[in-house]
Amino acid sequence: GWIYTSNSEVGNRGGGAGALRFNAEGELIDAYPILSGTTDNCAGGATPWSTWLSCEETAYGQVYECDVYGKRSAVLCPGLGYFKHEAVAVDPSWRRVYLTEDEKDGCLYRYTALEMMDDRFDFHSGLLEVASVDDEGYVSWIPLPNPTPKSYQSPTRLQVPRASHFNGGEGIWYHAGRIIFSTKGDNRIWEYDISKNFLRVIYDAKTLSRPVLTGVDNICVSSDGNVLVAEDGGDLQIVVLGPTGRAVPLVQIVGQDDSEMAGPAISPRGDKLYFSSQRGNGNGITYEISGRFLKGGR
Protein backbone atom coordinates (compact mmCIF):
# COMPACT_ATOMS: atom_id res chain seq x y z
CA GLY A 1 0.00 0.00 0.00
CA TRP A 2 0.92 3.67 0.29
CA ILE A 3 0.28 6.82 2.31
CA TYR A 4 -0.69 10.29 1.11
CA THR A 5 0.23 13.15 3.43
CA SER A 6 -1.36 16.60 3.50
CA ASN A 7 -0.52 19.72 5.46
CA SER A 8 -2.92 22.03 7.29
CA GLU A 9 -2.11 25.71 6.67
CA VAL A 10 -3.84 27.08 9.76
CA GLY A 11 -2.25 29.83 11.88
CA ASN A 12 -1.78 30.35 15.60
CA ARG A 13 -0.65 26.81 16.38
CA GLY A 14 -3.74 25.36 14.73
CA GLY A 15 -1.85 23.77 11.85
CA GLY A 16 -0.15 20.45 11.29
CA ALA A 17 -0.37 17.52 8.89
CA GLY A 18 -2.46 14.42 8.33
CA ALA A 19 -2.22 11.14 6.45
CA LEU A 20 -4.48 8.95 4.31
CA ARG A 21 -3.45 5.29 4.23
CA PHE A 22 -4.29 2.97 1.33
CA ASN A 23 -3.93 -0.78 0.99
CA ALA A 24 -2.27 -2.56 -1.94
CA GLU A 25 -5.54 -2.43 -3.91
CA GLY A 26 -5.70 1.35 -3.50
CA GLU A 27 -8.56 1.31 -1.00
CA LEU A 28 -8.58 3.94 1.74
CA ILE A 29 -8.20 2.13 5.07
CA ASP A 30 -7.25 4.83 7.57
CA ALA A 31 -6.91 8.58 8.17
CA TYR A 32 -5.12 10.22 11.10
CA PRO A 33 -2.99 13.21 12.19
CA ILE A 34 0.80 13.05 12.07
CA LEU A 35 1.56 16.59 13.32
CA SER A 36 -0.36 19.17 15.36
CA GLY A 37 0.22 22.41 17.23
CA THR A 38 2.26 24.09 14.50
CA THR A 39 1.60 27.19 12.38
CA ASP A 40 0.87 27.71 8.68
CA ASN A 41 2.17 24.37 7.45
CA CYS A 42 2.23 25.06 3.73
CA ALA A 43 4.15 22.32 1.93
CA GLY A 44 7.00 19.93 2.65
CA GLY A 45 8.53 16.83 1.13
CA ALA A 46 8.94 13.09 1.50
CA THR A 47 12.17 11.39 2.55
CA PRO A 48 13.63 8.17 1.07
CA TRP A 49 13.14 6.53 4.49
CA SER A 50 9.39 7.19 4.40
CA THR A 51 8.90 10.15 6.68
CA TRP A 52 7.30 13.50 5.87
CA LEU A 53 9.01 16.87 6.33
CA SER A 54 6.36 19.50 7.09
CA CYS A 55 7.27 23.17 6.66
CA GLU A 56 5.98 26.22 8.52
CA GLU A 57 5.47 29.23 6.27
CA THR A 58 6.12 31.92 8.87
CA ALA A 59 8.90 34.50 9.16
CA TYR A 60 10.93 32.24 11.46
CA GLY A 61 9.23 28.99 10.51
CA GLN A 62 10.66 25.57 11.21
CA VAL A 63 10.55 22.08 9.71
CA TYR A 64 9.23 18.98 11.45
CA GLU A 65 9.95 15.36 10.54
CA CYS A 66 6.75 13.32 10.83
CA ASP A 67 6.12 9.59 11.17
CA VAL A 68 3.63 8.91 8.36
CA TYR A 69 2.16 6.00 10.36
CA GLY A 70 1.28 8.39 13.18
CA LYS A 71 2.86 6.23 15.87
CA ARG A 72 5.72 8.53 16.87
CA SER A 73 5.66 12.23 17.69
CA ALA A 74 7.03 14.61 15.08
CA VAL A 75 10.58 15.85 15.64
CA LEU A 76 11.86 19.41 15.09
CA CYS A 77 14.66 19.77 12.50
CA PRO A 78 16.67 22.82 13.62
CA GLY A 79 19.45 22.09 11.13
CA LEU A 80 17.11 23.06 8.28
CA GLY A 81 16.99 26.65 9.52
CA TYR A 82 14.42 29.19 10.62
CA PHE A 83 12.80 31.10 7.77
CA LYS A 84 9.56 31.24 5.75
CA HIS A 85 9.73 27.63 4.62
CA GLU A 86 7.72 26.42 1.65
CA ALA A 87 8.91 22.98 0.55
CA VAL A 88 11.86 20.58 0.65
CA ALA A 89 13.40 17.96 -1.64
CA VAL A 90 15.85 15.26 -0.54
CA ASP A 91 18.85 14.26 -2.66
CA PRO A 92 19.82 10.86 -1.21
CA SER A 93 23.01 10.51 -3.24
CA TRP A 94 24.74 13.48 -1.62
CA ARG A 95 23.01 13.51 1.80
CA ARG A 96 21.43 16.83 0.94
CA VAL A 97 18.12 18.62 1.26
CA TYR A 98 17.09 21.57 -0.92
CA LEU A 99 14.64 24.13 0.46
CA THR A 100 12.54 26.95 -0.99
CA GLU A 101 11.53 30.16 0.79
CA ASP A 102 8.21 31.90 0.15
CA GLU A 103 9.34 35.53 0.22
CA LYS A 104 9.46 38.05 -2.62
CA ASP A 105 13.22 38.13 -2.03
CA GLY A 106 13.50 34.54 -0.84
CA CYS A 107 16.49 32.26 -1.30
CA LEU A 108 17.25 28.71 -2.34
CA TYR A 109 18.92 26.74 0.44
CA ARG A 110 20.88 23.50 0.67
CA TYR A 111 21.40 21.42 3.79
CA THR A 112 24.14 18.79 3.98
CA ALA A 113 23.80 16.13 6.67
CA LEU A 114 27.15 15.57 8.35
CA GLU A 115 25.95 12.53 10.28
CA MET A 116 23.57 9.64 9.70
CA MET A 117 21.24 8.05 12.26
CA ASP A 118 20.05 4.53 11.33
CA ASP A 119 20.45 5.29 7.61
CA ARG A 120 18.59 8.57 8.03
CA PHE A 121 19.86 12.13 7.83
CA ASP A 122 20.57 13.89 11.10
CA PHE A 123 18.58 17.12 10.85
CA HIS A 124 19.93 18.59 14.07
CA SER A 125 23.46 19.55 13.11
CA GLY A 126 24.67 19.94 9.56
CA LEU A 127 25.67 22.58 7.04
CA LEU A 128 23.03 25.01 5.75
CA GLU A 129 24.04 27.05 2.71
CA VAL A 130 22.43 29.58 0.40
CA ALA A 131 22.66 29.66 -3.41
CA SER A 132 24.58 32.36 -5.27
CA VAL A 133 23.97 32.25 -9.03
CA ASP A 134 26.30 34.00 -11.47
CA ASP A 135 25.29 35.65 -14.76
CA GLU A 136 25.79 32.40 -16.70
CA GLY A 137 23.68 30.29 -14.35
CA TYR A 138 26.41 28.55 -12.39
CA VAL A 139 25.71 28.14 -8.69
CA SER A 140 27.98 28.59 -5.69
CA TRP A 141 26.88 27.58 -2.21
CA ILE A 142 27.75 29.85 0.70
CA PRO A 143 27.41 28.81 4.37
CA LEU A 144 24.92 30.80 6.45
CA PRO A 145 26.45 32.54 9.48
CA ASN A 146 23.32 32.04 11.59
CA PRO A 147 20.78 29.46 10.27
CA THR A 148 18.50 29.78 13.33
CA PRO A 149 18.17 33.53 13.97
CA LYS A 150 16.07 35.08 16.69
CA SER A 151 13.40 37.62 15.75
CA TYR A 152 15.76 40.52 16.54
CA GLN A 153 18.57 39.11 14.37
CA SER A 154 19.12 39.28 10.63
CA PRO A 155 16.90 36.78 8.74
CA THR A 156 18.66 34.06 6.80
CA ARG A 157 17.88 35.53 3.36
CA LEU A 158 19.71 38.76 4.25
CA GLN A 159 22.79 37.29 5.93
CA VAL A 160 24.88 36.66 2.80
CA PRO A 161 25.33 39.67 0.46
CA ARG A 162 26.05 37.43 -2.54
CA ALA A 163 22.89 35.33 -2.08
CA SER A 164 20.58 35.15 -5.09
CA HIS A 165 16.95 36.00 -4.52
CA PHE A 166 13.90 34.29 -5.99
CA ASN A 167 10.42 35.77 -6.23
CA GLY A 168 8.29 33.53 -4.03
CA GLY A 169 9.80 30.04 -3.84
CA GLU A 170 7.15 27.30 -3.93
CA GLY A 171 7.22 23.57 -4.71
CA ILE A 172 10.49 21.66 -5.09
CA TRP A 173 11.30 18.10 -6.18
CA TYR A 174 14.34 15.87 -6.72
CA HIS A 175 14.44 13.78 -9.89
CA ALA A 176 17.33 11.99 -11.62
CA GLY A 177 20.13 14.24 -10.44
CA ARG A 178 18.16 17.44 -10.81
CA ILE A 179 16.21 19.75 -8.53
CA ILE A 180 13.02 21.23 -9.99
CA PHE A 181 11.33 24.16 -8.23
CA SER A 182 8.79 26.90 -8.89
CA THR A 183 8.59 30.62 -8.12
CA LYS A 184 5.13 32.16 -8.01
CA GLY A 185 6.05 35.85 -8.25
CA ASP A 186 7.34 35.49 -11.81
CA ASN A 187 5.55 32.25 -12.82
CA ARG A 188 8.72 30.31 -13.51
CA ILE A 189 9.81 26.68 -13.23
CA TRP A 190 13.52 26.15 -12.62
CA GLU A 191 15.87 23.20 -13.06
CA TYR A 192 19.13 22.82 -11.14
CA ASP A 193 21.59 20.25 -12.47
CA ILE A 194 23.36 19.02 -9.35
CA SER A 195 26.46 17.54 -10.99
CA LYS A 196 27.05 20.63 -13.15
CA ASN A 197 26.05 23.19 -10.49
CA PHE A 198 23.97 24.84 -13.20
CA LEU A 199 20.56 26.53 -12.90
CA ARG A 200 18.20 27.32 -15.76
CA VAL A 201 14.58 28.32 -16.33
CA ILE A 202 12.53 25.62 -18.07
CA TYR A 203 9.20 27.48 -18.07
CA ASP A 204 8.54 31.22 -18.03
CA ALA A 205 4.94 32.39 -18.43
CA LYS A 206 5.90 35.93 -19.43
CA THR A 207 7.55 34.66 -22.62
CA LEU A 208 4.21 33.28 -23.86
CA SER A 209 1.37 35.32 -25.35
CA ARG A 210 -1.30 32.98 -23.91
CA PRO A 211 0.31 30.90 -21.16
CA VAL A 212 -1.49 27.71 -20.19
CA LEU A 213 0.21 27.67 -16.80
CA THR A 214 0.13 30.57 -14.32
CA GLY A 215 -0.07 30.80 -10.54
CA VAL A 216 2.62 28.12 -10.21
CA ASP A 217 2.76 26.46 -6.79
CA ASN A 218 3.26 22.87 -5.57
CA ILE A 219 4.91 20.39 -7.93
CA CYS A 220 5.72 16.72 -8.29
CA VAL A 221 7.65 14.84 -10.96
CA SER A 222 6.65 11.50 -12.49
CA SER A 223 9.17 8.71 -12.98
CA ASP A 224 9.50 9.59 -16.66
CA GLY A 225 10.32 13.23 -15.92
CA ASN A 226 7.01 15.00 -16.47
CA VAL A 227 6.56 17.92 -14.06
CA LEU A 228 3.08 18.29 -12.59
CA VAL A 229 2.42 21.86 -11.45
CA ALA A 230 -0.53 22.85 -9.26
CA GLU A 231 -1.96 26.33 -9.71
CA ASP A 232 -2.70 28.77 -6.90
CA GLY A 233 -4.90 31.10 -8.91
CA GLY A 234 -4.52 30.83 -12.66
CA ASP A 235 -7.29 28.50 -13.88
CA LEU A 236 -7.11 26.21 -10.80
CA GLN A 237 -5.51 23.45 -12.83
CA ILE A 238 -2.79 20.87 -12.54
CA VAL A 239 -0.67 21.30 -15.64
CA VAL A 240 1.86 18.79 -16.99
CA LEU A 241 5.13 20.27 -18.19
CA GLY A 242 6.81 17.77 -20.51
CA PRO A 243 10.52 17.37 -21.33
CA THR A 244 10.13 19.68 -24.35
CA GLY A 245 8.65 22.44 -22.18
CA ARG A 246 5.13 22.09 -23.57
CA ALA A 247 2.44 22.73 -20.93
CA VAL A 248 -0.72 20.59 -21.06
CA PRO A 249 -3.65 20.89 -18.60
CA LEU A 250 -4.44 17.63 -16.81
CA VAL A 251 -7.28 18.49 -14.43
CA GLN A 252 -9.21 21.61 -13.42
CA ILE A 253 -11.35 22.45 -10.38
CA VAL A 254 -14.43 24.59 -11.08
CA GLY A 255 -16.74 26.41 -8.69
CA GLN A 256 -14.06 26.87 -6.01
CA ASP A 257 -12.59 30.21 -7.02
CA ASP A 258 -11.39 31.08 -3.50
CA SER A 259 -9.31 27.92 -3.25
CA GLU A 260 -5.99 26.71 -4.64
CA MET A 261 -4.68 23.42 -5.97
CA ALA A 262 -2.17 21.77 -3.66
CA GLY A 263 -0.24 18.61 -2.87
CA PRO A 264 -0.07 16.71 -6.18
CA ALA A 265 1.31 13.20 -5.73
CA ILE A 266 1.34 10.03 -7.84
CA SER A 267 0.84 6.54 -6.43
CA PRO A 268 3.81 4.14 -6.64
CA ARG A 269 2.10 2.21 -9.46
CA GLY A 270 1.52 5.41 -11.41
CA ASP A 271 -2.21 4.80 -11.80
CA LYS A 272 -3.56 7.29 -9.28
CA LEU A 273 -3.08 11.03 -8.86
CA TYR A 274 -3.87 12.71 -5.54
CA PHE A 275 -4.28 16.43 -4.94
CA SER A 276 -6.18 18.78 -2.69
CA SER A 277 -8.32 21.87 -3.08
CA GLN A 278 -7.06 23.82 -0.09
CA ARG A 279 -10.32 25.53 0.83
CA GLY A 280 -12.83 23.82 -1.47
CA ASN A 281 -16.23 25.38 -0.88
CA GLY A 282 -15.34 26.16 2.71
CA ASN A 283 -13.35 23.15 3.84
CA GLY A 284 -10.41 21.44 2.19
CA ILE A 285 -11.06 18.54 -0.20
CA THR A 286 -8.65 15.81 -1.28
CA TYR A 287 -9.23 14.16 -4.67
CA GLU A 288 -8.11 10.92 -6.31
CA ILE A 289 -8.02 10.37 -10.06
CA SER A 290 -7.41 6.90 -11.49
CA GLY A 291 -5.96 6.08 -14.90
CA ARG A 292 -2.74 5.10 -16.63
CA PHE A 293 -2.01 8.65 -17.70
CA LEU A 294 1.55 8.65 -16.36
CA LYS A 295 4.21 6.01 -15.90
CA GLY A 296 4.41 6.80 -12.20
CA GLY A 297 6.70 8.49 -9.71
CA ARG A 298 7.09 9.32 -6.07
Which functions belong to the PLM regions below?
Residues G1-R298:
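Sequence/structural signature of beta-propeller domains
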